[in-house]
């Protein structure tokens, strides 16, 4: 942990496609909110969810809560556009699912610049690469 990193006691996932949930998240007692554009959003809602989330984050009101945007994998039809949109939202971090190697994070960094990244390692192969990914 760096001097600027604080431990997170509670992190809540909120679907990026649900305006009511995005509004409710402004008052939740948690340290961080992960705004999910991946698993919590059906394929037919993904583009609209990206726009809904952008509006919610532009409106603000999340206080000191860490704001993390979970995008779709870069190997999906939504991933690259999610990454570009997430970078424009200026979150505290972007969460990339299904990271298998450092190359996945390097590809995302090419798109989002210096925004901090969170890596979800979800496969045995990723676990074997954990030291390199970290």
Region locations from a protein language model:
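Conserved alpha/beta-domain cores
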Residues: 2-134
């Amino acid at each position: 942990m760096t001097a600027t990193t604080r431990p997170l006691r509670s992190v809540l996932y909120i679907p990026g496609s649900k305006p009511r949930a995005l509004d409710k998240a402004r008052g939740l007692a948690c340290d961080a909110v992960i705004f999910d554009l991946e698993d919590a959003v059906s394929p037919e809602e993904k583009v609209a969810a990206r726009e809904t989330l952008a509006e919610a984050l532009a409106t603000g009101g999340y206080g000191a809560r860490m704001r993390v945007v979970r995008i779709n994998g870069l190997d999906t039809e939504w991933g690259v556009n999610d990454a570009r949109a997430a970078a424009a939202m200026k979150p505290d971090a972007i969460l990339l699912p299904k990271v298998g190697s450092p190359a996945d994070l390097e590809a995302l960094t090419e798109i989002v610049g210096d925004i901090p990244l969170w890596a979800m390692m979800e496969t045995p192969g990723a676990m074997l690469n954990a030291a390199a990914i970290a």
